[in-house]
A protein has these predicted regions:
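Non-catalytic C-terminal accessory region of glycerolipid acyltransferases
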Residues: 1-25, 37, 67, 89, ...
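Alpha-helix initiation/capping motif
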Residues: 5, 32-33, 75-77, 98, ...
Length: 214
């Protein structure tokens, strides 16, 4: 079904309405010991969250960053079309691309967005995994932009798990949702592949720390 057909537009409007109603039943709590939300008033960040927790990010970003525009990296696939529409309907921007399609162009657009003062969201193990292993793109963006990576995690009291490669989380209605922020991580220049891999693993471990401390 083409996304510009009347049937598609009707289904999208219905789906968005149901999504908003469902999201309003959830109870959100923020844990921000490093004062990231306060610091974000003065600088843009690269927010990083694992792919299997991304469903609630549009309302979460509206809740946590009402004062700063945010842009998300969304897969250029057909599945990504619907995600992009959802993100944009919540008032956020999108950059389309992935590691296998339009990748480098998308990453440079994210660098430009950060230079313009916009927060950037990257799911570093998406869109295909491996699960909980970050790809090189987020390190590239951090090095080129000079912006810090902020590990972010969403923990759900009650959720369904899909049979996808990442066992995607869908919170059940009325579930509690904890939004956790870790310490900002700067990534400097690297002299070669070994240093680059060291930085990649350091950022990966920072994200996993939030998962393990849930």
């Amino acid at each position: 079904m083409k996304l510009d057909s009347w049937r598609a537009r009707a289904l999208i409007a219905l789906g968005l309405g149901m999504f908003r109603l469902w999201a309003r039943t959830l109870r959100f709590g923020v844990e921000d010991p490093e004062k990231i939300l306060s610091a974000s008033r003065d600088q843009p960040f690269i927010l990083s969250v694992w792919h299997n927790r991304l469903l609630l990010l549009p309302p979460v970003f509206s809740l946590c960053f009402p004062h700063r525009r945010s842009v998300g990296l969304i897969s250029a696939s057909r599945d990504g079309d619907f995600v992009a529409i959802l993100v944009e309907r919540f008032g956020h921007g999108t950059v389309r691309g992935s590691s296998s399609r339009k990748g480098i162009i998308a990453l440079r657009q994210l660098v430009d967005a950060l230079a313009a003062g916009t927060n950037v969201l990257i799911t570093p193990d998406g869109p295909r995994g491996p699960l909980y292993e970050i790809n090189q793109g987020i390190i590239f963006v951090a090095q080129k932009s000079g912006a810090a990576i902020v590990p972010m995690h969403l923990e759900f009291a009650n959720a369904w798990r899909l049979k996808s490669w990442d066992r995607f989380f869908v919170p059940k209605p009325f579930s509690e949702v904890r939004i956790l922020f870790g310490a900002a991580q700067r990534v400097g220049p690297t002299a070669g592949p070994e240093e680059f891999e060291h930085e990649r693993l350091r950022i990966q471990n920072a994200l996993m720390k939030l998962v393990e401390e849930k």
